[in-house]
C-alpha cells in the first residue's frame, strides 16, 4: 500500500514539475482555469529577446511603379509619400504590458524590427518613425531602436531612392494632475539615424502618465502569481519584471549638468515643453516636436486648455512645426463649444446641461445615481437630491477620475457621455479647448508688436502599440489592429481585481476626497470605455522632391504635409 502511495506521489510530483516548467503536453494545461489556446507559441520570444529585420527589400519595379504613378497623378515634380510618425513597440511600458499573455488581443512581443517589416511589406509605407515612450526606456532599448532603424535603412537600397526610410525619436509623455500643469504628449523626431547625430539617451517627462508610473520602480512589477496560473508563459511574465528592475536600477541624471555631458545610462527628464526644448538645443541636432492626442480625455484633465502653454517659455516655432490631428486614439482637430464643467459666479464648479450634441459625463453620473435610487424604491424627491449631489461631486474632481464618484459603475451605464456626436471619430472624453482648431485660433498679446501663436502643419499617424506602422489601410481584425485591449476573460479580470480596491454599486455618490485612484490601480482608468472609441490609425503625407531622407525631412520642415484617417488620399 505504501509503495502504491509512494508511486502515486512521485507521479504527481513529476507531473507538477513538468507542468510548472512548461514541459508538459498542451492538454495537461487545460485543467488550469486561465488556460487559452496558443498554437503558434506566440510568447516564446520576449521583448528582451534580440530581434532582426527581414534582410530583403521591395522589388525595384514596385518602387519605380509607385513613384511614376504618384508623379503622374500629381502633375508635379514632387511626389506624395505616405508614412507613420508615431509608432510604439514593446519597448514601451504600456505596449509591453498590453502584450502580456493574459491580455486579450495580445500575441507576443513586437520589437522595433517588426515595425520595419510591417511598414515595408504589409502597409508598404514610404517612411516611418519609431517613437517609444521616453519614460520607459533603458539604455539598451534606446540603442536597440537605433540599430533597428539602421538595419532597416541598410536594406533599403540606394539611399537616394530607397524602398523605405526609417527614422527614430521618442515620445515625451507628459500628463498633468490638473489642467494648470498639463502639457500633454509630444513626439520628438530626429532626422538622422547615426548614433553620433542623436542624443545618447531619451529625455522623459515629469508627470503621472501611465507609461511613467508603469515602471520606474519595483512597485511596477507584475505579481509572481501570473506565472503560476499560466506556467506555459511564465518566462514572458518574468521578462516584464526583469525589465522593470533594469529601469528601477537606472540612476536619475543630475539636473545641474547639461544634457550632452550626462552619462548615457541615466534617466533624464523635463517638466515642461520649454525645459524639453532647452535640453534639445543643448544637443544641437535637427529635430521636430509634434504634440498629439491633445483632446484625448483618457489622460487629459478637465478644462485643459492651450492658453497656459502659449507663452515665450513653452513655445518654439522652429521645433513645433507640426501637430498630429488624427490617430488610432481618435480625432483631435475640431473645436466644439462645450465643456466638461463650468464655474459659476461664486467660483464653484457646476455641471452643464446636455445638448443635442453632447452629454456631459457629470450629468450622466446624476442619471446613474437617480436610476439606482429609484430602483430601490426611494422617494422621487430624495432620488432627485442624490442625483444633484452626484453631478456636483463629479465636477469637484480636478483629475480624470470623476467617474469614480459613481461607485461600481459599468461602461454601459455611461452611454456616450463625454463624446461629441457630430465629429468624425472623436477621441475619448473629448476636451475641445485642446483641439487643433482652438489652438490655431489663439494668440498671446503679451507683446502687442509680436504676438505669439501656433502655426502647425497637420499629420496623421497610428499611435500603434504593436509596431503595426500604417495599420489604417484596412479596417479589419480590431483586437490586433487597434489598441483596444484589456484582460483576456473574466478569470483574469478576477485576478487583476483581487489586488485592487473596487467599490460596489451604491445608490449614492462619493465625494472627491472619498475616491482612491491609487488603490483602484488599473480600474482607476476607464479602459473599457476608452477601448470603445479606438480605431485603426491615420497616415502622414508629405509633398517631397524625392524618396530620400533629406527630401522627406525637408517637406516636414516646410509643413508640406497633410494627414489622413488611414487611407492614401
Describe each model-derived feature in a short phrase.
Residues 5-9, 15-569:
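Extended, charged catalytic domains and RNA/DNA-binding interfaces, predominantly
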Amino acid at each position: 500500500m505504501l509503495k502504491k502511495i509512494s508511486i502515486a506521489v512521485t507521479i504527481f510530483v513529476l507531473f507538477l514539475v513538468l507542468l510548472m516548467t512548461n514541459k508538459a503536453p498542451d492538454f495537461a494545461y487545460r485543467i488550469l482555469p486561465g488556460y487559452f489556446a496558443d498554437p503558434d507559441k506566440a510568447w516564446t520570444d520576449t521583448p528582451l529577446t534580440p530581434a532582426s529585420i527581414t534582410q530583403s527589400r521591395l522589388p525595384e519595379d514596385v518602387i519605380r511603379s509607385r513613384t511614376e504613378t504618384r508623379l503622374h497623378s500629381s502633375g508635379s515634380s514632387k511626389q506624395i509619400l505616405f508614412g507613420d510618425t508615431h509608432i510604439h513597440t514593446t519597448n514601451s511600458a504600456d505596449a509591453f504590458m498590453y502584450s502580456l499573455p493574459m491580455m486579450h488581443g495580445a500575441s507576443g512581443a513586437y520589437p522595433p524590427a517588426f515595425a520595419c517589416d510591417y511598414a515595408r511589406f504589409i502597409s508598404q509605407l514610404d517612411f516611418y518613425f519609431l517613437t517609444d515612450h521616453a519614460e520607459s526606456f533603458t539604455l539598451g532599448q534606446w540603442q536597440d531602436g537605433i540599430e533597428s532603424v539602421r538595419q532597416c535603412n541598410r536594406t533599403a537600397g540606394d539611399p537616394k531612392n530607397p524602398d523605405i526610410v526609417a527614422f527614430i525619436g521618442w515620445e515625451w509623455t507628459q500628463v498633468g494632475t490638473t489642467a494648470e500643469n498639463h502639457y500633454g504628449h509630444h513626439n520628438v523626431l530626429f532626422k538622422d539615424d547615426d548614433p553620433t547625430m542623436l542624443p545618447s539617451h531619451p529625455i522623459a517627462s515629469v508627470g503621472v502618465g501611465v507609461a511613467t508610473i508603469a515602471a520606474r520602480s519595483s512597485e511596477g512589477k507584475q505579481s509572481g502569481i501570473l506565472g503560476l496560473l499560466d506556467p506555459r508563459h511564465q518566462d514572458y511574465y518574468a521578462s516584464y519584471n526583469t525589465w522593470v528592475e533594469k529601469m528601477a536600477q537606472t540612476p536619475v541624471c543630475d539636473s545641474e549638468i547639461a544634457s550632452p555631458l550626462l552619462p548615457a545610462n541615466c534617466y533624464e527628464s523635463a517638466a515642461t515643453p520649454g525645459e524639453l526644448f532647452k535640453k534639445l538645443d543643448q544637443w544641437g541636432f535637427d529635430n521636430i516636436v509634434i504634440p498629439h492626442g491633445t483632446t484625448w480625455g483618457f489622460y487629459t484633465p478637465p478644462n485643459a486648455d492651450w492658453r497656459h502653454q502659449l507663452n515665450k517659455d513653452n513655445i518654439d516655432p522652429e521645433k513645433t512645426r507640426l501637430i498630429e490631428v488624427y490617430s488610432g486614439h481618435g480625432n483631435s482637430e475640431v473645436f466644439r463649444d462645450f465643456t466638461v464643467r463650468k464655474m459659476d459666479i461664486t467660483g464653484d464648479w457646476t455641471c452643464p446641461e446636455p445638448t443635442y450634441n453632447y452629454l456631459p459625463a457629470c450629468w450622466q453620473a446624476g442619471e446613474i445615481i437617480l436610476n439606482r435610487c429609484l430602483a430601490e424604491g426611494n422617494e422621487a424627491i430624495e432620488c432627485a437630491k442624490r442625483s444633484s449631489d452626484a453631478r456636483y461631486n463629479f465636477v469637484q474632481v480636478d483629475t480624470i477620475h470623476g467617474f469614480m464618484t459613481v461607485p461600481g459603475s459599468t461602461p454601459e451605464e455611461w452611454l456616450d457621455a463625454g463624446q461629441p456626436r457630430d465629429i468624425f471619430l472623436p477621441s475619448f472624453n473629448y476636451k475641445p479647448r485642446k483641439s487643433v482648431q482652438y489652438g490655431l485660433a489663439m494668440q498671446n498679446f503679451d507683446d502687442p508688436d509680436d504676438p505669439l501663436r501656433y502655426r502647425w502643419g497637420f499629420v496623421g499617424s497610428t499611435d500603434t502599440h504593436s509596431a503595426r506602422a500604417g495599420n489604417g489601410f484596412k479596417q479589419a481584425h480590431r483586437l490586433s489592429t487597434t489598441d483596444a485591449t484589456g484582460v483576456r476573460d473574466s478569470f483574469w479580470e478576477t485576478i487583476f481585481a483581487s489586488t485592487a480596491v473596487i467599490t460596489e454599486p451604491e445608490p449614492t455618490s462619493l465625494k472627491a476626497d472619498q475616491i482612491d485612484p491609487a488603490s483602484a490601480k488599473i480600474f482607476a482608468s476607464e479602459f473599457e470605455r476608452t477601448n470603445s472609441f479606438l480605431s485603426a490609425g491615420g497616415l502622414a503625407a508629405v509633398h517631397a522632391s524625392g524618396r530620400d531622407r533629406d527630401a522627406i525631412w525637408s517637406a516636414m520642415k516646410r509643413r508640406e504635409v497633410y494627414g489622413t484617417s488611414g487611407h492614401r488620399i
